């Protein structure tokens, strides 16, 4: 196989692993939301905040990606009229350093951050 073919396969593997993390099928992945985003979306009660988090999770699972994000590791979406950014970062299994190989789930932990553009 050519180097280009190998690169495409690697990119698609990373994209599929990112999809699994976004859709809740990767038990090692973490999903975090910035306090600014939760403050803007959530209400004054714990119940309202939990409902805002549920809406964010639904948007995360169904977001679409621009062609310039082949690994599906960055997206912009709208939740309740608020622009929300989604970014996937790749860490080692201890969450201390960057992963040496994001295509290898045995050595990579994904952290998905949901934030406002101002938080980026």
Predicted regions and their residues:
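Compact soluble domain cores
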Residues: 4-78
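Short, compact, well-ordered microdomains
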Residues: 73-120
